[in-house]
């Protein structure tokens, strides 16, 4: 339990930030999973559209500091590699 008003506020802020970070990470994972499932199913046109959305989600998470920029870049690279291999 926080002992001071500032500690109470810090606890509230930390909770809000944690929830926002969890939501954003969940969105990233969901968008990546969606693309992978579409690629595995063979629907490449839908997968390409979903990949654009996934890249945007990754960029936003990196911009907000939720993901490290290089982590986002690596995930985008692997996603596009999988998509391009399926297109061949």
Swiss-Prot record:
GO cellular component terms, semicolon-separated: cytosol; small ribosomal subunit
Region (Disordered) residue spans: 1-28, 69-88
Molecular-function GO term, any one: structural constituent of ribosome
Pfam families registered for this protein in UniProt: Ribosomal_S20p
Gene3D superfamilies: Ribosomal protein S20
Basic and acidic residues compositional bias, start-end: 1-23
Keywords tagged on the record: Ribonucleoprotein, Ribosomal protein, RNA-binding, rRNA-binding
InterPro entries given in the database record: Ribosomal_bS20, Ribosomal_bS20_sf
Family: Belongs to the bacterial ribosomal protein bS20 family.
Protein's name in the database: Small ribosomal subunit protein bS20
Upper taxonomic lineage: Bacteria, Bacillati, Chloroflexota, Dehalococcoidia, Dehalococcoidales
